[in-house]
Amino acid sequence: MSQQKTMSAGLLISALGVVYGDIGTSPLYALKETFAGHHPIPVTPENIFGVLSLVFWTVLLLVTVKYVIIIMRADNHGEGGSLALLALVTELTKGYRVHYPLMMLGVIAAALFYGDSMITPAISVLSAVEGLEVVTPNFKPYVVPITAVVLTGLFFIQKRGTGLVGMMFGPVMMAWFGVLAVLGVVNILAEPHVLAAINPLYAADFIIKHPLMSFFALGSVVLAVTGGEALYTDMGHFGRPPIRIAWFGLVLPALLLNYFGQGALLIGDPTAIQNPFFRMGPEWMVVPMVVLATCATVIASQAVISGAFSVARQAIQLGLLPRMTIIHTSGDEEGQIYVPFTNWTLYVAVMALVIGFQSSSNLAAAYGIAVTGTMMIDTILVAFVMALMWRWPLALVIAVAGTLLLVDLAFFTANAIKVAQGGWFPVFIGIVSFTVLTTWRRGRELVRNQIKKLAVPLDVVMRALGPDVARARGTAIFLTAATDGVPPALLHNLKHNQTVHQRVVLATVMTTEAPYVPDTERIVLTELGNGFYRLLIRYGFMQTPDIPAALAACKPLGLEFNMMSTSFFLSRETYVPSLNPGMAMWRERLFTFMTLNATRATIFFKIPTDRVVELGTQLEI
């Protein structure tokens, strides 16, 4: 076997473990919730055929056509996901009136993602452990405690990294999809006519004859495609080919076979609706299936947690969240990170959901809103990619995006009516997250504007550097968000100490709209004269800044740094409300609170703490 084929096989197996955990565990609860959820549907052959047809065409349209075929083409330099798509679209729409509304839509998608990332671990592991109730109802009191123990273990190992355990994810998920397919085939052979539900006329007939019932059914059918957006989100890790091959070659057939197998089981035994997945095999298989299902749901949860870490880093780099501690858990993979604040926030929320909702059925009502909302926003954003990047004819854009948007809207509306039954949770988390993201973004914008107002032109400072101003030995690096003028920290140093270093570097760390900036394009150095330099350090939104490494990269450009003779000057800003505040008072207080609790710049930028001087600055915002 060639190295290329070995690598491809490895990528395929890895993709199974990371990309498909969420959608792969949907058979545990999707059909069960459709027929026995908050809006139960009578388990009749006619309804089973109608629902199966809806599931089949929903998976094909929303996952296969929308994500695998269309949206996965809209990569941002190889990266996918809502924030990567947002960065791409905001770049494409600069100068257009829709620029700001689209940016806000992307922020809403990121906010909804956090609601989704809290619900997925809870509902997935609960649904797996609930299989024990099929063995004996006596296990019911232990479902929540077992789920809590499993999830607690998962969150506590995050800080150690999951590289070693992650090697098992792919093989476990391959076994999982194999079991899904085999169980499906065995049950289909007992009722082979169930395959007729592939015909979309069954779905159409179900909708026409039972409009209200079918509307409620949509709210649960969408559970079959939760996790479909992960195919696009994880594209940066594996690339398009492995994800598409795994989808068409194993995941899609296994999922559809299992759903049709569950349908066949229900035709023969309608009482199996209480937990059709675990009734698909013989009794002796239930416990092994529970173990395998628990492993699969833990893997699905891990993928969501890792995704939350990645989104947090992207949001920080794109200026939507304050600095947080980011720990790299692998020396080889830049994408393997651990964000403590995100981890423990998710843990508290997940535990609250498990204890508060008690069952996967109760949680199912909360699940759909975040997913359908995100999918709807992805459709809107990719429509602009179709028009502005791919240059599709307007009629084609309207036809394709309009059709997908109508489908998304139908599913979103069907889930919106479940607000009282649990849908309030992702809505609440979405509102809180959106408020935090937009408040931080607006606050930083106000701070930048104020710093620009206070900044003194560089030529004025240069003229002020007369013979009476002492020049200290060594190098002073002033970190500043502005790419012109002189930062407040330098002015304070000059005012109070009457001295300037022999070399002064005005350094700005900039995040681009691209996920990665190659090392060769990282540094832009400009000599300003009289020992002054302006240094622009560029990173992608998927990268973590490292100031010492960036300074070392300046050596080939003629600027070498000795850390023992280099001092870093940082501004420590305190904020007071102005007479005409740029935000509501409560948002200014929230912004100040986030600033006070943000990770210190020295830690975030990896600056040696013994070489740092902080100078206080008071700003009105």
UniProtKB/Swiss-Prot annotation:
Catalyzed chemical reaction(s): K(+)(in) + H(+)(in) = K(+)(out) + H(+)(out)
Single GO MF annotation: symporter activity
Coiled coil: none
The organism's place on the tree of life at top rank: Bacteria
Keyword Transmembrane helix: yes
Keywords from the UniProt entry: Cell inner membrane, Cell membrane, Ion transport, Membrane, Potassium, Potassium transport, Symport, Transmembrane, Transmembrane helix, Transport
GO cellular component: plasma membrane
Membrane topology, from the record: Multi-pass membrane protein
Transmembrane region(s): 11-31, 51-71, 103-123, 137-157, 165-185, 206-226, 247-267, 285-305, 337-357, 369-389, 392-412, 419-439
Broad class of the protein's primary localization: membrane
Protein localization: Cell inner membrane
Similarity remark: Belongs to the HAK/KUP transporter (TC 2.A.72) family.
HAMAP family, alphabetized: Kup
Job description of the protein: Transport of potassium into the cell. Likely operates as a K(+):H(+) symporter.
Protein known as: Probable potassium transport system protein Kup 1
